[in-house]
């Protein structure tokens, strides 16, 4: 026997006990380096917008329309039409979005990857994606998977007689699973005990509807934020009822909370459920124990397909997906009002599917023979409903809307078209990001509209003059930088909302957020508005400076002054072109979830949380699309610029506040300082001179983690070095400029 045979490889790179195994509460800095160029197979200069705009979208749609009725033997189409399957694919791609943190949604094509590709609620969607491959192959990189999923859903609707509201492209694919999305703590599929077992305080929607988009609603179940789905591996609610209990009224409570957390009101919710369930069927031909492992657990020879079904033929009439066997309407491949006709036209009783799942059929055998079979023309069935469908009849608010839609089919069609468009585009950000010839002309309030630039912009000479005015206004460096940061740092890379453009910091609700220090904010805005009015009043030819631009420019001017006082003559990049939104263009309830209830960059915590502040900082930095070095240099710069929200001035490790130095890092890692907790919860600390015992500094957990965590300390050492001052200033300005321009999609 050879030596090679005697000494086989038992382990490979990355195997063995990991740091995460040893220290499960470690700071996950890798969340700040996701989706890097190293994972992207496309050329560095690939421009997706340019590629998509070169696409013949009509030709793509024509090919998709042909696919709808091109039934394949390996996965036959129900009723001879793949439309319902593709609607479900698009719906489930977009439906993971939640307004609480903006994560999830269709924007990255994440349905291709774990865990979503293997969620119990996504059974058989692996087949839908394989059916699409010939079209993706044909058009290649001109259309992303993310865009193709949603476009296919639209074409599915259109080929079944429905007029959609429009389509916007622009979703760029990623090439690895998202690691930052919190799907829940449950360790078993369809588990829901932990997301309802946490007693955190959450806002309850008031009568005006404020809070409905991200808080809990009445019903006694306290769903953990930011989750929207009721169970691990579901997109929305359990169709059988809460935890499988077939109680339509209780189901209505879950529906209202879940859809609200997806930014949908009651009318949009009814339209989406009824509109989606106008088409197709569910699948529960036999017991679930006939279904094999999900794609991520399947054998190599299955080539990424999962849920191999041993019941009968394993496909067609023998398909098992949800375990429910429901066909809602008599025309499952045609747009109609038949869902409501059946919902209100029959009295319903509980039954079970062949797989043993709870579902509903008309009482006394009514409706027999009115529903076609999906694969055998000689067979007919009774209509059937899910518990979550019956909820639309028993809940008073839903019932009122549903009857109105039943009696006004054109209104229903319009409501569904708009709700479907919102569902599939909610995570794309402002309308300026949409691509293609089918983008609707109408501005919608949930798109956070901002007026287009309609006047000449300030030039370099104007910028210099405005900087002088700002610096002579009596406002401090801290006040100017704080205001600019507050305006820009609402941005979320998850759903592309927030940011400095629009100057919504002067409007409700942002002007009243605790993190923005409303009194100081009002003072700064009053001065800046005066400078704006004076400048605009003296211009000819319609030239103006928006308040949105002036807020950012003022922050840049303050940083230049702070760097100058440290001996560095710098120019902070500034590009005009922001506009000011109005209060009428700002949905207060919709913006409420953007409130930073924690912001480590300003040492702010609205209340105490179970999650340590340093972990919340990583969450905030990830939403701001920052890398670990960018986060680090921003913290160090903002601290010495005296940007904070606490009276204790935690983390201001300098005797020259307002001057852009690397003092934060030098003093943090100085071994002459000994740190001690100053609160029982170890949320604040004091730094003492090791020799004299004299107190030198105070700090938060966020401050000290840059000296405690090994990776962050390594970064801090770079900026604390004697030769690092120039680099620190350069890197801070670069990271600052990035944040100020995160929502400047016109520059990208």
Curated annotation (Swiss-Prot):
Listed InterPro entries: Catalase_peroxidase, Haem_peroxidase, Haem_peroxidase_sf, Peroxidases_AS, Peroxidases_heam-ligand_BS
Region of interest (Disordered), residue spans: 201-223
GO molecular function: catalase activity; heme binding; metal ion binding
Location in chain, cross-link Tryptophyl-tyrosyl-methioninium (Tyr-Met) (with W-91): 236-262
Binding residues for heme b: 277
Transmembrane residue ranges: none
Post-translational modification: Formation of the three residue Trp-Tyr-Met cross-link is important for the catalase, but not the peroxidase activity of the enzyme.
The reaction(s) this protein catalyses: H2O2 + AH2 = A + 2 H2O; 2 H2O2 = O2 + 2 H2O
Keywords of the record: Heme, Hydrogen peroxide, Iron, Metal-binding, Oxidoreductase, Peroxidase
Residues joined by cross-link Tryptophyl-tyrosyl-methioninium (Trp-Tyr) (with M-262): 91-236
Classification via NCBIfam families: cat_per_HPI (TIGR00198), PRK15061.1 (NF011635)
PANTHER family from the UniProt entry: CATALASE-PEROXIDASE, HYDROPEROXIDASE I, BIFUNCTIONAL CATALASE-PEROXIDASE
Subunit and partners: Homodimer or homotetramer.
Protein name: Catalase-peroxidase
Highest classification ranks of the organism: Bacteria, Pseudomonadati, Pseudomonadota, Betaproteobacteria, Burkholderiales
